[in-house]
Amino acid sequence: MKQYLLGFTLVFALIACAQKGANPEQKGGDADVLNTSKTEKYLNKNLPSEAEDLVSLFNDSEIFVSKEKNKDGKYVLRAIVDTVELKGVADKNDGSEGKLEGLKPDNSKVTMSISKDQNTITIETRDSSNTKVASKVFKKDGSLTEESYKAGQLDSKKLTRSNKTTLEYSDMTNAENATTAIETLKNGIEFKGSLVGGKATLQIVESTVTLTREIDKDGKLKIYLKDTASSSKKTVSWNDTDTLTISAEGKKTKDLVFLTDGTITVQNYDSASGTTLEGTATEIKNLEALKTALK
């Protein structure tokens, strides 16, 4: 009888030990299941459901559009922007003229608007008090305009053109005035200046020569050069072919051509008469090379 009870006690002890040893593993298993569930839920947000169609937009963004209209006769839209899930509606199943919105963890609001022709997508962020903080406007031509705000007022702006050159404004007092303006062309060549009355004036200075790019409100470009030297002063002419012809002592010396892709080329005239271009135009690869061309 004692042996029977001893054996019975031993079995219970073994069961208790087994359960005790299994608990940490069980807890870990529960956590793994929970984490896996969260991951799957996040991944599922990035995929269309059976009731949705995937619509690709021009800037590599995607929206999910319901296959059927809701009770109000609208198509339901969904999108993920910087991990934030946005929801909204549109009249058409391509998402055009749709507006979506969603909240970040800090209660700031993100909205996404799609134009009627689907050529413009605007993403705007407002803080928890509904004050505008930032905006991005994507164009189908590949350009992007980014704005940031302080206390609801425009503070900085960056335009990335379709050719990937940029024009940046900072310390802005309003939409037409900025203390600092920087234009970056291909090969990292920077022109610096300011924005006054909607017109950007940007310069590169080399010794007595100042090369200026002037961009008006409509984006029209004019380039001119000023030389303060007392002798052998350089003069220039600017034409509609985006060519700046530099002359000295009454003879043409070189052409600087500002191409639409953001590059600058230089080509010299013959030194004897200054009437014939020699060789081929070469691309200016950096700021120092441009300054050399201005000498």
UniProtKB/Swiss-Prot annotation:
Lipid linkage positions (N-palmitoyl cysteine): 17
Keyword Membrane: yes
Signal peptide bounds: 1-16
Transmembrane listed as a keyword: no
Protein name: Outer surface protein B
Annotated GO CC locations: cell outer membrane
Coiled-coil stretches noted in the UniProt entry, renumbered to this chain: none
Major site of localization recorded for this protein: membrane
Disulfide feature: none
Compartments in which it is found: Cell outer membrane
Lineage, top ranks: Bacteria, Pseudomonadati, Spirochaetota, Spirochaetia, Spirochaetales
Membrane topology, as annotated: Lipid-anchor
UniProt xrefs under InterPro entries: OM_lipoprot_Borrelia, OM_lipoprot_dom_sf
Lipidation feature positions (S-diacylglycerol cysteine): 17
Keywords: Cell outer membrane, Lipoprotein, Membrane, Palmitate, Plasmid, Signal
